[in-house]
A protein has these predicted regions:
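Ribonuclease/tRNase effector modules and their secretory precursors
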Residues: 1-150
């Protein structure tokens, strides 16, 4: 069972997964013009990005699927699945259309040497954008969450 903690409460502080900042890593050359491994990190954020934004804007939806309301746990579950990687219209943003009940979109922003999670939300149909790759979370996620079927 993964352990989630925070480095602090400021908007640029991080959620940690088992003591590390990376929730997943997109390997080098998976995306156009990205030649280095790119970790995916969840920052505390504010009203516009990160766990604070996700709780404020999508909290009711989140609690239906993550009853304790822990954004870090839910994001980790989503990043342990697979989906399409899309380039979105906004500069420096990447969309991951990930599938795990519920279907969702996870939006990343390129910060330079890592991707910061901007938001995650319910998205029944596909995102608008150019498909540039496939995200394979069960291979790339840090300590992948494995859904147990009953």
């Amino acid at each position: 069972m993964p352990n989630f903690t925070q480095t602090g409460t400021g908007q640029y502080d991080y959620w940690l997964l088992d003591g590390g900042k990376a929730f997943s890593t997109i390997p080098a050359n998976t995306l156009p013009s990205i030649s280095a491994d790119m970790p995916i990190r969840l920052q505390v954020g504010n009203g516009y990005f990160g766990s604070t934004h996700i709780t404020a804007r999508h909290g009711k939806w989140l609690e239906r699927y993550q009853p304790d309301g822990c954004v870090a746990t839910f994001v980790h579950k989503k990043l342990s699945t697979s989906g399409k990687i899309l380039l979105l219209e906004e500069k420096n943003k990447i969309g991951l259309a990930l599938t795990l009940n519920p279907n969702s979109a996870l939006i990343l922003r390129n910060i330079g040497d890592f991707f910061s999670i901007t938001t995650v939300y319910y998205k029944k149909s596909g995102l608008e954008g150019e498909v540039v790759g496939r995200y394979t979370g069960y291979q790339w996620a840090t300590s992948p969450h494995i859904e147990r079927r009953r």
